[in-house]
Amino acid sequence: MQIYLDTANLDEIRTAASWGVLSGVTTNPSLMAKEKGADFKATIQEIASLVDGPISAETTALDADGMVREGREFAAWHPNVVVKVPSTTEGLKAVSRLAREGIRCNVTLCFNAIQALLAARAGAFIISPFVGRVDDVGVDGMDLIREIVQIYRQHRITTLVLAASIRHPRHIVEAALAGADIATCPFKVLEQSMRHPLTDIGIERFLADWKAWQQGK
């Protein structure tokens, strides 16, 4: 399973990229809004220079014509740009048109399996089910991932399943077990994923033993 970072913060992306684990980056209007004074185009292009993989840039238009217009513009910024559109009927229209032009799309804000199936039929490159938000309404978000994966495999659909709205490291593990192709997570969650108290204790013990051995020579 591939790991993407869900952020528009360049410092976070540089740091995570240095760990050698990133396969892509996802952004959205809310994440961009956190980067005060940043230029959208320049930010996406800088991200593409830091991570050699799909970079999702989301449209803000609500109609298909607007999404297509923005999507074409975004795709011209860098070959790795993937255009994010919402799981709506207008979004499906836009995906269908953009896909015919060879522009890859990430259909976002997916909350049920039928949305995922229709997005794939329209030509989506990626579908993004929101695990955490589904959990918030009392439904198991990982069940949604499993349903989509099963449908796609049964019908030999090549659209990639990206687990989004990841809240904690366990979500990443569960997404991998459920068969997701990708998990995208905030920097904080990715950083937490490599922390374990027993790892810290083990390092301290090894260093203490090494120091004692060196002093005893």
From Swiss-Prot:
<dbReference type="GO" id="GO:0005737">
    <property type="term" value="C:cytoplasm"/>
</dbReference>
<dbReference type="InterPro" id="IPR033919">
    <property type="entry name" value="TSA/FSA_arc/bac"/>
</dbReference>
<dbReference type="GO" id="GO:0004801">
    <property type="term" value="F:transaldolase activity"/>
</dbReference>
<comment type="similarity">
    <text>Belongs to the transaldolase family. Type 3B subfamily.</text>
</comment>
<keyword id="KW-0704">Schiff base</keyword>
<protein>
    <recommendedName>
        <fullName>Probable transaldolase</fullName>
        <ecNumber>2.2.1.2</ecNumber>
    </recommendedName>
</protein>
<dbReference type="InterPro" id="IPR018225">
    <property type="entry name" value="Transaldolase_AS"/>
</dbReference>
<dbReference type="InterPro" id="IPR013785">
    <property type="entry name" value="Aldolase_TIM"/>
</dbReference>
<dbReference type="Pfam" id="PF00923">
    <property type="entry name" value="TAL_FSA"/>
</dbReference>
<keyword id="KW-0808">Transferase</keyword>
<dbReference type="InterPro" id="IPR001585">
    <property type="entry name" value="TAL/FSA"/>
</dbReference>
<dbReference type="GO" id="GO:0006098">
    <property type="term" value="P:pentose-phosphate shunt"/>
</dbReference>
<dbReference type="GO" id="GO:0016832">
    <property type="term" value="F:aldehyde-lyase activity"/>
</dbReference>
<dbReference type="GO" id="GO:0005975">
    <property type="term" value="P:carbohydrate metabolic process"/>
</dbReference>
<keyword id="KW-0570">Pentose shunt</keyword>
<keyword id="KW-0963">Cytoplasm</keyword>
<dbReference type="InterPro" id="IPR004731">
    <property type="entry name" value="Transaldolase_3B/F6P_aldolase"/>
</dbReference>
<comment type="pathway">
    <text>Carbohydrate degradation; pentose phosphate pathway; D-glyceraldehyde 3-phosphate and beta-D-fructose 6-phosphate from D-ribose 5-phosphate and D-xylulose 5-phosphate (non-oxidative stage): step 2/3.</text>
</comment>
<dbReference type="InterPro" id="IPR022999">
    <property type="entry name" value="Transaldolase_3B"/>
</dbReference>
<feature type="active site" description="Schiff-base intermediate with substrate">
    <location>
        <position position="84"/>
    </location>
</feature>
<comment type="function">
    <text>Transaldolase is important for the balance of metabolites in the pentose-phosphate pathway.</text>
</comment>
